């Protein structure tokens, strides 16, 4: 609550999951899949204790996915289907989840850096005109607030987008921010493709969720890709079973590390971009020479796609190799002094929400210079809102 007794709500609209709750809390009050489903055939009224409705959102949609045609309203951190996104927000603010009266609430929304302005403008319009929130703030780089750091590099990879954002003394350096539109959802798609090559067919919209769960359970990042490839070819060490919802059992071998490898080698899915290690190295090396060592010592991982076992050690190995080759030109004596620290907090899946909860709590009473009020929106329109956020409309 702020000093006027208004609730301060934080919503992290992820491409894969919505995390929502209150300012100053240590964990989201609700986490549910950002998906909307409609029944393929209206035959039954109930399945177990879930009533089948014309429109299903969130967990119920995920549980009954075999009977539904499923849509994901967001892609790469950008809302592609505003009607379906509206259903997700109705679910978020309605009696099923937060159960709030928006007119009495302040709302902090999150978004990935380098998102198009049009997406942000439409978000403001919907929140003020459709829901009537009292005041709103939209923030991009929130992870460091959760870690209590003022300087560092955030490597955030969720379901829709991966980005690397350096923050110095509390200011995000937008000119150095790097964005890669490869994240969890692309890994799931690639895993579906790899399984298809083995003869397992997952082409129904509901199978996507099944493969996502399989990916979370079994995939990992290879420390040494060549060694893992040899193991996959010559032994059964990597082979693991997975039971599908219909009871069938499938085996995964090399696919377990091949799917997430696209983070480091985007060319595997025909994307001509640098991989994660290259992007991070390029981002830090492009920063001011005085800040680089600070950045190397404070690399913070955030988002669900950074949860793969082996990711921090692989990132560290490749960063060190790049630094040795390109900066020190193979001088191993100087390399001894080079220090890297990659922080992988256990709660990093919800890091953006936690940072938002910290920021919203700090700023809850700063109406003049922080929150954009409904009155300001009505008087000055979207240009006024953007100006207050420090964004050129």
From Swiss-Prot:
<feature type="binding site">
    <location>
        <begin position="303"/>
        <end position="308"/>
    </location>
    <ligand>
        <name>ATP</name>
    </ligand>
</feature>
<dbReference type="GO" id="GO:0005524">
    <property type="term" value="F:ATP binding"/>
</dbReference>
<keyword id="KW-0547">Nucleotide-binding</keyword>
<protein>
    <recommendedName>
        <fullName>Actin-related protein 2</fullName>
    </recommendedName>
</protein>
<keyword id="KW-0067">ATP-binding</keyword>
<dbReference type="InterPro" id="IPR004001">
    <property type="entry name" value="Actin_CS"/>
</dbReference>
<dbReference type="GO" id="GO:0005938">
    <property type="term" value="C:cell cortex"/>
</dbReference>
<comment type="function">
    <text>Functions as ATP-binding component of the Arp2/3 complex which is involved in regulation of actin polymerization and together with an activating nucleation-promoting factor (NPF) mediates the formation of branched actin networks. Seems to contact the pointed end of the daughter actin filament.</text>
</comment>
<feature type="binding site">
    <location>
        <begin position="158"/>
        <end position="160"/>
    </location>
    <ligand>
        <name>ATP</name>
    </ligand>
</feature>
<dbReference type="InterPro" id="IPR020902">
    <property type="entry name" value="Actin/actin-like_CS"/>
</dbReference>
<comment type="similarity">
    <text>Belongs to the actin family. ARP2 subfamily.</text>
</comment>
<keyword id="KW-0009">Actin-binding</keyword>
<dbReference type="InterPro" id="IPR043129">
    <property type="entry name" value="ATPase_NBD"/>
</dbReference>
<keyword id="KW-0963">Cytoplasm</keyword>
<dbReference type="GO" id="GO:0034314">
    <property type="term" value="P:Arp2/3 complex-mediated actin nucleation"/>
</dbReference>
<dbReference type="GO" id="GO:0005885">
    <property type="term" value="C:Arp2/3 protein complex"/>
</dbReference>
<keyword id="KW-0206">Cytoskeleton</keyword>
<dbReference type="InterPro" id="IPR004000">
    <property type="entry name" value="Actin"/>
</dbReference>
<dbReference type="GO" id="GO:0003779">
    <property type="term" value="F:actin binding"/>
</dbReference>
<feature type="binding site">
    <location>
        <begin position="212"/>
        <end position="216"/>
    </location>
    <ligand>
        <name>ATP</name>
    </ligand>
</feature>
<dbReference type="Pfam" id="PF00022">
    <property type="entry name" value="Actin"/>
</dbReference>
<comment type="subunit">
    <text>Component of the Arp2/3 complex.</text>
</comment>
């Amino acid at each position: 609550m702020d000093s006027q007794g208004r609730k301060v709500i934080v919503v992290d609209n992820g491409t894969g999951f919505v995390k929502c709750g209150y300012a100053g809390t240590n964990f989201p009050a609700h986490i549910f899949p950002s998906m909307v489903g409609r029944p393929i055939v209206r035959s039954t009224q109930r399945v177990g204790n879930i009533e089948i409705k014309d429109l299903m959102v969130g967990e119920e949609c995920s549980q009954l996915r075999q009977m539904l045609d499923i849509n994901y309203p967001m892609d790469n951190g950008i809302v592609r289907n505003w009607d379906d996104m509206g259903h997700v927000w109705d679910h978020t603010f309605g009696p099923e989840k937060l159960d709030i009266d928006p007119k009495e609430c302040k709302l902090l929304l999150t978004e990935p850096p380098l998102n198009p302005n049009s997406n942000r403008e439409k978000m403001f319009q919907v929140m003020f005109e459709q829901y009537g929130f009292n005041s709103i703030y939209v923030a991009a780089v929130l992870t460091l607030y959760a870690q209590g750091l003022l300087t560092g590099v955030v490597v955030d990879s969720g379901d829709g987008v991966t980005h690397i954002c350096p923050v110095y003394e509390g200011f995000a350096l937008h000119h150095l921010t790097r964005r890669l539109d490869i994240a969890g959802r692309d890994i799931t798609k690639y895993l579906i493709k790899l399984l298809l090559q083995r003869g397992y067919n997952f082409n129904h919209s509901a199978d996507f969720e099944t493969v996502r769960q399989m990916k979370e359970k079994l995939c990992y990042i290879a420390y040494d890709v060549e060694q893992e490839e040899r193991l996959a070819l010559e032994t059964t060490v990597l082979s693991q079973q997975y039971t599908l919802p219909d009871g069938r059992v499938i085996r995964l071998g090399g696919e377990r590390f091949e799917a997430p490898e696209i983070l480091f080698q985007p060319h595997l899915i025909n994307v001509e971009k640098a991989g994660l290690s290259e992007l991070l190295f390029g981002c830090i090396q492009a920063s001011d020479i005085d800040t680089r060592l600070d950045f190397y010592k404070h690399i913070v991982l955030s988002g669900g796609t950074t949860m793969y076992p082996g990711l921090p050690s692989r990132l560290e190995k490749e960063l060190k190799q790049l630094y040795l080759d390109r900066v020190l030109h193979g001088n191993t004596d100087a390399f001894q002094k080079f220090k890297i620290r990659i922080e992988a907090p256990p709660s990093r899946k919800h890091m953006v929400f936690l940072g938002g909860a910290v920021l919203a709590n700090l700023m809850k009473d700063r109406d003049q210079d922080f929150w954009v009020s409904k009155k300001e929106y009505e008087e000055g329109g979207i240009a006024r809102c953007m100006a207050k956020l420090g964004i050129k409309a």
